[in-house]
Amino acid sequence: MELQKGKGAAAAAAASGAAGGGGGGAGAGAPGGGRLLLSTSLDAKDELEERLERCMSIVTSMTAGVSEREANDALNAYVCKGLPQHEEICLGLFTLILTEPAQAQKCYRDLALVSRDGMNIVLNKINQILMEKYLKLQDTCRTQLVWLVRELVKSGVLGADGVCMTFMKQIAGGGDVTAKNIWLAESVLDILTEQREWVLKSSILIAMAVYTYLRLIVDHHGTAQLQALRQKEVDFCISLLRERFMECLMIGRDLVRLLQNVARIPEFELLWKDIIHNPQALSPQFTGILQLLQSRTSRKFLACRLTPDMETKLLFMTSRVRFGQQKRYQDWFQRQYLSTPDSQSLRCDLIRYICGVVHPSNEVLSSDILPRWAIIGWLLTTCTSNVAASNAKLALFYDWLFFSPDKDSIMNIEPAILVMHHSMKPHPAITATLLDFMCRIIPNFYPPLEGHVRQGVFSSLNHIVEKRVLAHLAPLFDNPKLDKELRAMLREKFPEFCSSPSPPVEVKIEEPVSMEMDNHMSDKDESCYDNAEAAFSDDEEDLNSKGKKREFRFHPIKETVVEEPVDITPYLDQLDESLRDKVLQLQKGSDTEAQCEVMQEIVDQVLEEDFDSEQLSVLASCLQELFKAHFRGEVLPEEITEESLEESVGKPLYLIFRNLCQMQEDNSSFSLLLDLLSELYQKQPKIGYHLLYYLRASKAAAGKMNLYESFAQATQLGDLHTCLMMDMKACQEDDVRLLCHLTPSIYTEFPDETLRSGELLNMIVAVIDSAQLQELVCHVMMGNLVMFRKDSVLNILIQSLDWETFEQYCAWQLFLAHNIPLETIIPILQHLKYKEHPEALSCLLLQLRREKPSEEMVKMVLSRPCHPDDQFTTSILRHWCMKHDELLAEHIKSLLIKNNSLPRKRQSLRSSSSKLAQLTLEQILEHLDNLRLNLTNTKQNFFSQTPILQALQHVQASCDEAHKMKFSDLFSLAEEYEDSSTKPPKSRRKAALSSPRSRKNATQPPNAEEESGSSSASEEEDTKPKPTKRKRKGSSAVGSDSD
């Protein structure tokens, strides 16, 4: 299992005849297929592989038989011709790296030289291969892919963290200890361990790595090889948890669940002792285990432990398979992923994923699609291990234990109650065991927090009734099918829910005709599939994909996707004869080209002078029915090229858009087509983002994005902002890839609508994954995208404080990609509470430590109220002490003098506009005293600097006795300075030896500022404080006053 590391690719190739290295025991001798992907003689050639091989041949033809310098010149000259040529060369070199290990080092060097986009093309292609093609990738290519990622990380390429997270997603859990899977787990771990300093720069990567390897530790036991890997994983996780606990805190309550599974490992046993008894040892901002348990885990973490293939199959079942027809799919899933004894632990990951990530739209809920509770019921009934069954039940109820209606979603707790409700008739034992577990988990989960758990479960049940998931719980809790002891326990624990005699009325339409959970179809249904074998496909694409939030790679059974004939008869009689004939032609048209011709004739007829505009509504109804498939299919092509984009906008419906682009805006025909689109929009709101896509993708619409504004004004909404936000929301719900594709042009073309609030930003960060985040960051840094501007960035970041943890981190990453001075958003500090806003505080703290402190920054930091658990101000002041002691001393001196010289009456009568930024003398002294205590056992001599001592003297001379008493230790430093200043000049010269300059080379203790990330602040609304431009007083003037 020895892997290629660093420059080992070329060396390994030379030693083994370009075999490419281990790959978990696999070699280059693949059993058939192309250079990249495994395939059989029956498989069609993969489009992606064809394209990459084409690009590789272009590079090879330019570099074969010439010197290295000539090859470099040829590549650079070709790249300079345009973006398509740049992409071809980058992908060609990338493919050579994967397929020719002997040339890997040279090709990587060439790639670094010719890349004009910070390797963005290569990073995107790696992500695509990992998500879609990894299972079919040749072993040599897998090995080289790991080598390439290691090189990208070593080079510090922006976005490599996203690729590492995608790689981690490919590591299968659930007891998969096959050679290839273990090789991958160890390879990624080696990269993260070797490049530790790079890992520590990304909070998201730290959290994702800890979550991934904490989960994998449980599976790695038995052989000496697995034990060795397990120890490396333990050391890795423990080091990050102990050194960067605040970053790991973003995982939320599922971190506790994973830590419980490894609690008996000695290193984690010690960690648990600190979490329970000494939380401050992990981070000054960590108040205890309750803080973790009350934090909801983002869906990004829950999704990361399912491989892309597993996730695709599960999403397919929850969005396409009809209830009653799921048995074949479940049998396949069982054989593929749940057939071994060790794989039982995977059920927890699946249940957490279904509860926390799969949140069906109302359209799916109201259909006959397989509901979530049925899949969970199947996972519970087929579980063969008692330990796995207990863990699966805990996974199902986990969000109940500390449920808060303000922070948690009803969708996370809904499956558990519906499993119990629907199982009562066919499987009363399942309902009984779940109800029993719900009662017993309250006192047993963690006895010191029993009250909180009881409140969480009670809040969950209350919320379920309030939202009418079930109208009453009494028929469930007091059902005669339950034994008397269980019913008595339920009455004792939950008397509030046992009183109603009414039967339960389920409002959510998740209940199908049959409630039986053994998932057997009737004979009649079964006969439909006698000749059809259900099969998941790893490599084929579902061309009829409805694409709800995900891109699926699966062919369903043919019978399930047959479209029912469209019935437009009710509308035809209301149309003129000639128009009716054309609509019927359109319905009968078999190919796109013919339909486009008919569609153009319909548009021409609409534009005729004698056309009756009252028929527009009827025509719109016909078109909406006829083109339903357009709105269900994929909009954005998989491979984005000029040709594929132009082909994608060749749909008949888009003829209306094309005609619109060719007209003058003051033309009556233009208004008529807008009216037709407005009628269509009323009947099918998705038309809005289809128009946006057309204006973005079509060459005919170049520079015509302003047409969307005319369209928005023509709709019943009549408002550009409202219309744009509704259309982007519809796009977000249907197709995240398209949302990301549209984002740069939407922000560029409609800056006033997008940049003035965080509405669109929130839509984006709520659904993107780490790869898409990295892509957006690259767009920002390349100047293609501006998501923040100075006049509104502060308000948007304040709005983001109410978002989910991962969404906030995404927002901050995107902000930091912009070149906006930190001082613009420093007033956000006044809104940040140390318990409620750890995400923003962590990001702000890490960014402040990179800045030279300005007086305004220091003022804002010192303006925060003092609290014993709030270490934010002390953390950043300590860091600035170490790096910029003289500058910080001058700023603090200036602020002390200003606040001391202001009359008390004036301070209290400040206008409300500056109330948030108000800084009091007592606040400054309290923070300085905390800093003094923090520096007590260090060799840092910050408080012996002349400006600080002069300012303290100045304050001491005029403050009252209460303050002198309260800050006596702080003022005693000034008294010592005063004593030394009255001595002869010779003594003064000696004292000068301890001046800041002479202390510059003093040994400084290691900093702990990176662990600080929480603080407190005022709840009042923000108003920007005006920057002060007063001249700073010279130290000599203040010194002479004191003397």
From Swiss-Prot:
The keyword Ubl conjugation does not apply. Residues 977-1043 are annotated as: Disordered. Pfam families: HEAT_Ints3_C (PF24566), Ints3_N (PF10189). One of its GO terms (biological process) is mitotic G2/M transition checkpoint. Its main location: nucleus. The keyword Transcription regulation does not apply. The modification Phosphoserine is found at residues 502, 537, 995. It is found in: Nucleus; Cytoplasm. GO terms for cellular component: cytoplasm; INTAC complex; integrator complex; nucleoplasm; nucleus; site of double-strand break; SOSS complex. The modification N-acetylmethionine is found at residue 1. Residues 1008-1022 have a biased composition (Acidic residues). Keywords: Acetylation, Cytoplasm, DNA damage, DNA repair, Nucleus, Phosphoprotein. Component of the Integrator complex, composed of core subunits INTS1, INTS2, INTS3, INTS4, INTS5, INTS6, INTS7, INTS8, INTS9/RC74, INTS10, INTS11/CPSF3L, INTS12, INTS13, INTS14 and INTS15. The core complex associates with protein phosphatase 2A subunits PPP2CA and PPP2R1A, to form the Integrator-PP2A (INTAC) complex. Component of the SOSS complex, composed of SOSS-B (SOSS-B1/NABP2 or SOSS-B2/NABP1), SOSS-A/INTS3 and SOSS-C/INIP. SOSS complexes containing SOSS-B1/NABP2 are more abundant than complexes containing SOSS-B2/NABP1. PANTHER family: INTEGRATOR COMPLEX SUBUNIT 3. Belongs to the Integrator subunit 3 family. Component of the integrator complex, a multiprotein complex that terminates RNA polymerase II (Pol II) transcription in the promoter-proximal region of genes. This is Integrator complex subunit 3. It comes from Homo sapiens. The gene is INTS3.
